Each structure stands twice: as structure tokens, then as C-alpha cells.
From Swiss-Prot:
Membrane topology: Peripheral membrane protein
Pfam family, one: FMN_red
Entry protein name: NAD(P)H quinone oxidoreductase YCP4
NCBIfam families: flav_wrbA (TIGR01755), PRK03767.1 (NF002999)
UniProt GO MF annotations: FMN binding; NAD(P)H dehydrogenase (quinone) activity
Amino acid sequence: MKIAIIQYSTYGHITQLAKAVQKGVADAGYKADIFQVPETLPQEVLDKMHAPAKPTDIPIATNDTLTEYDAFLFGVPTRYGTAPAQFFEFWGATGGLWANGSLAGKPAGVFVSTSGQGGGQETTVRNFLNFLAHHGMPYIPLGYANAFALQSSMEEVHGGSPYGAGTFANVDGSRQPSTLELEIAEKQGEAFVKSATKLVKGSKKTNTTTTSKSAATSDAAGTTSGTAAGTSAATGAATGTSAPKESTKEASSSAKKEATNGTATRTQQSTKAPETAEKSSCSKCIIM
């Protein structure tokens, strides 16, 4: 199972959580690769925000990333209780994948970063589920079973919820993820693997079984057809019957006419109706 951690981070808080989640995945016996979604803000704006340069050792996520990997963990900083524009742009470019159902059945989890309590630790994840739902991607929450003691700790103010790991960054980004928050993120990585492997292995097993059944059915049909043809030929040879030449000519002529008509009909049916150019991936959602 190939796991990708796809995240966006302005000041590095989400990236720190991503690395903790990656460690949790490794502790569960799997490997996860970290990616970052493309930046949409101009450098001039980023400079005014005093945002550090993006890590050069973390590759950019593309549609190919989504098709090549089997399961995903998304690191999402909040913007007014939902994902930032960078993630909306990222998902907005996946219309082709949506049309083909390329991501259907691929499990996903989410972890977040907000400025403080009430800043969207839960709503950011819930709003992010819109993307997963439209693509048919099963959502795997952190829950409580794997990290209850950590999540319910009252020793310090901390991020995270049953929806996923989280951190508080403060309004100016000065607060860094605490040891407790990083431990919860690790637990999410471990818990995600336990559930995702069941879904991915089950999906692959189903696909393999379906393919095998189709092949077996095809082989059986071919064998039956061949046997029937052989029996028919043997029967004809044994009785020594043959059709009159005139009847053969008439049958041949009739077959040619039917073939010609059939070809014309298929040609007519296969002619494509005029198509309206799709302006954006969202137009499909509006129409449907």
C-alpha cells in the first residue's frame, strides 16, 4: 500500500505534524511520502506575510500523485473554518479524475492547524470532507481508541480531535506544535494504517476476483462455442446433406445486405452529438 501525505503549510506547523504522522505510519510498518500542494500566493504577498521559503526537499503534489498512491493523509491549515485557497485550487484541477472515478475507494485522513481554540479544529476537517465525498474517498478519522489518554489530557491546552490530529499556531504563528500534539499525530499515522490496509487490500482482492471470474466466463464461453461448432460440423458430415447452390447464393446475398445495413446503422449510432465545451470542473457539479 502506497501512502501519500499531502499538505500545505505557510509557516511550517502543518509540515511538522506531517512528519510526525509519517513517523506513525513507519511505526505501523509502512512508508509514507510527504508532498506539498502548489502555492497560489505571489511572492510579494508571502514576503509581506513574513512567510519562510517552502521546503525544497518536499515535492509538489499533482494529479499523478493522486492516481499513483493508494491512501492519503491531508495536512490542512484552516482559513475561516475551512481549507485554504491552495487546497481549493488543488482539488479544482481534479475534474478529470472525478469524471473517471479514479479516486473512488481510496481512503483518506485529515489533520489540521488553527490559530487557537474555536478556530476550526473540527469544522476544517468536516468542510474538507466535501472533496472526499465527491471523489468517493472513504474518510478515516482518528477517533479515540488509539489515543484517548493523549487527546483527553488536561495538562495543557492542545489541538486535535477525534476528526484528526491538530495544533494551535497562535494568531502570529509563534506557537510551535507541542510534544503532546506531535504524539497525537504519530498515533493518527498508526491508526490510519490499521484501517486503510483493510480497505485497500479488500478493494484489490475484489478487483482480482472480478477479473478472474470474467476470464473464466470468457474461456467457458469459448469452449462451449467451439464444442457446438464441432458437433454441428460432424453432424453435417455424417448425414452427407448439403444445401442447394441457389439457396446458398441467396443466403450469401441476404447476409451481405444485412451486413451493409448493420454497418450503416452502427455508423449512425456511433456519430457523436455536438458537445458543449466544459469551462471548468465545477460546471459538472452545477449541471448534475
